[in-house]
């Protein structure tokens, strides 16, 4: 068990308007290669669907610790001290160019989720995946600027 230090925001790196299911994410992450990554656990705690609904992928006890059964594989080197959330989207229609494709419903759901999370865990840094791995464009939007726009200063 480790202290929770980060909430990482991710995108699924799928085209704008393409819904993603929990089953797809499980297949991408837990199926053996070459179909998936062969991980024991999916990479995200919660999935933000296009309609703004939020689906829990990995249960957790919502405290300030990351227990072994709560660890998700969203960012190498940070998983034991992080929770990871993901929105469906993140790529332009060409399927290659990073783009903030969040729907209005996803933006509102993520805003509510992050504000609630920050209220319960004010010591936790909320970051985009690319802030911890510069090789990534994920989540395809400027998380620090967005946090400031919703009233969170870190």
Give each language-model segment a name.
Residues 35-37, 43, 72-74, 115, ...:
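Generic structural signal for short, flexible, solvent-exposed coil/loop and linker residues
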Residues 63, 68-77:
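Short amphipathic alpha-helices and their capping/turn segments at secondary-structure boundaries
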Residues 21-24, 69-72, 100, 141:
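Surface-exposed beta-strand edges and their flanking turn/coil or helix-capping segments
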Residues 47, 69-72, 123:
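Short, flexible coil/turn micro-motifs enriched in small/turn-prone residues
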